[in-house]
Swiss-Prot record:
Signal peptide feature range: 1-17
InterPro entries named in the record: Hemopexin-like_dom, Hemopexin-like_dom_sf, Hemopexin-like_repeat, Hemopexin_CS, M10A_MMP, MetalloPept_cat_dom_sf, Pept_M10_metallopeptidase, Pept_M10A
Name the UniProt record assigns to this protein: Stromelysin-1
Binding site for Ca(2+) 1: 124, 199, 201
Disulphide-bridged cysteine pairs: 290-477
Gene responsible for this protein: Mmp3
Family the entry assigns: Belongs to the peptidase M10A family.
Length: 477
């Protein structure tokens, strides 16, 4: 009951300072909303006793002006209609000003590669729609920083993403439908970095409800260390903008300046791949990258980039750069073999596996993992298999496919064992892929099978080959 006298006195002070609404009931509701809003977002709670003791309304007027200034309203110091209207709009649950306990000292991640995990799902959207919205939201920040992100399916990630209602274990309960949509914590261990979404909202892919992508992009800005912005055009403005044209969405300059003040501009970082000195970047000793006869030994993704291996070199293709970069394999990973047979990435383990002959190696970024090489037969392949031609891992199904001559085996990444019922004929399950597979990787929802100097674009949903391309078409040749 301690809160009741405070609330009543607050009503007396504010109502005596300026007129609010005609209805006393509206006055009470407005005062209650004002108190909660200022307590939640403008640090009123620690100051309440001070202005009560002084019997002076100047502090509450000052707090209202502070709120109005931050939200871009006219600084009347009064609970006018424009202020009331904005206070009723859906918004982020993170405070706008004042000391927020999880944001001391402008924290940031002390690494460039960050993992995330979607702990549970809202029933409002298909799982793949939630996955896509979160991936797209992270991409917004990845495109303007050196940061890269990968998703894991179990264990503790840097950013744990969850949907919840009411009290959900962090002592910052959600309020039901409307108003508070989500909240997130600044970078750090434990709960820090995590993002929580109110599952009492109606989450949508468009703006007919609460758009998950827009809210996620905002909250993940907090997970990366950003505060709220006072600029209404910014993604980090605290109030949700349902009128946003999703087809024309882009970060404001204020958002870009803020995130780059923490992490810098989009350049390669040591946590992804350390670019060697120019003396190590040699001209190809094999076929030039635009040669019509060029073929690859292996192809794999690595943290959003694509690596094309050939002899003792590899081309590194990033979405941020129009042209691939060419390096010695040994300049990044001294122990890896040249003329490798296959390579694939398991994104939820942040690991790339490299195969040559009957052995395989493992790398994480520029780090070579201990305990390798291992025999390919430890994976459950029969002794008759002497080498692997190509491999790819499906991050959604958590299955890895090993291609050997005209057959393939399937490995369960969760159980860490080969699945029964294999091998199967490649041509039966991948119609149109009739020749031997040299390499394979996934991009844009398609599988790209390489055979000699050609590649087949395969639609796994339609189960058919959609295009036949040159192997080096990725190099703008």
């Amino acid at each position: 009951m301690k809160g009741l006298p405070v609330l009543l006195w607050l009503c007396v002070v504010v109502c005596s300072s300026y007129p609010l609404h005609d209805s006393a009931r509206d006055d009470d509701a407005g005062m209650e909303l004002l108190q909660k809003y200022l307590e939640n977002y403008y640090g009123l709670a620690k100051d309440v006793k001070q202005f009560i003791k002084k019997k002076d309304s100047s502090l509450i007027v000052k707090k209202i002006q502070e709120m109005q200034k931050f939200l871009g309203l006219e600084m009347t110091g009064k609970l006018d209609s424009n202020t009331m209207e904005l206070m009723h709009k859906p918004r982020c649950g993170v405070p706008d000003v004042g000391g927020f306990s999880t944001f001391p000292g402008s924290p940031k991640w002390r690494k460039s590669h960050i993992t995330y995990r979607i702990v549970n799902y809202t029933p409002d959207l298909p799982r793949q729609s939630v996955d896509s919205a979160i991936e797209k939201a992270l991409k917004v920040w990845e495109e303007v920083t050196p940061l890269t992100f990968s998703r894991i399916s179990e264990g503790e990630a840097d950013i744990m993403i969850s949907f919840a209602v009411g009290e959900h274990g962090d002592f910052v309960p959600f309020d039901g439908p409307g108003t508070v949509l989500a909240h997130a914590y600044a970078p750090g261990p434990g709960i820090n970095g995590d993002a929580h979404f109110d599952d009492d909202e109606r989450w949508t892919e468009d703006v007919t409800g609460t758009n998950l992508f827009l809210v996620a992009a905002h909250e993940l800005g907090h997970s990366l260390g950003l505060y709220h912005s006072a600029k209404a055009e910014a993604l980090m403005y605290p109030v949700y903008k349902s009128s946003t044209d999703l087809s024309r969405f882009h970060l404001s300059q204020d958002d870009v300046d803020g995130i780059q003040s923490l992490y810098g501009t989009p350049t390669a970082s040591p946590d992804v791949l350390v670019v060697p000195t120019k003396s190590n970047s040699l001209e190809p000793e094999t076929s030039p990258m635009c040669s019509s006869t060029l073929f690859f030994d292996a192809v794999s993704t690595l943290r959003g980039e694509v690596l094309f291996f050939k002899d003792r070199h590899f081309w590194r293709k990033s979405l941020r750069t129009p042209e691939p970069e060419f390096y010695l394999i040994s300049s990044f990973w001294p122990s890896l073999p040249s003329n490798m047979d296959a390579a694939y990435e398991v994104t939820n383990r942040d690991t790339v596996f490299i195969f040559k002959g009957n052995q395989f190696w493992a790398i994480r970024g520029h780090e070579e993992l201990a305990g390798y090489p291992k025999s390919i037969h430890t994976l459950g392949l029969p002794a008759t298999v002497k080498k692997i031609d190509a491999a790819i891992s499906n991050k959604e199904k958590r299955k890895t496919y090993f291609f050997v001559e005209d057959k393939y085996w399937r490995f369960d990444e969760k159980k860490q064992s080969m699945e029964p019922g294999f091998p199967r004929k490649i041509a039966e399950d991948f119609p149109g892929v009739d020749s031997r597979v040299d390499a394979v990787f996934e991009a844009f929802g398609f599988l790209y099978f390489f055979s000699g100097s050609s590649q087949l674009e395969f639609d796994p949903n339609a189960k058919k080959v959609t295009h036949i391309l040159k192997s080096n078409s990725w190099f703008n040749c």
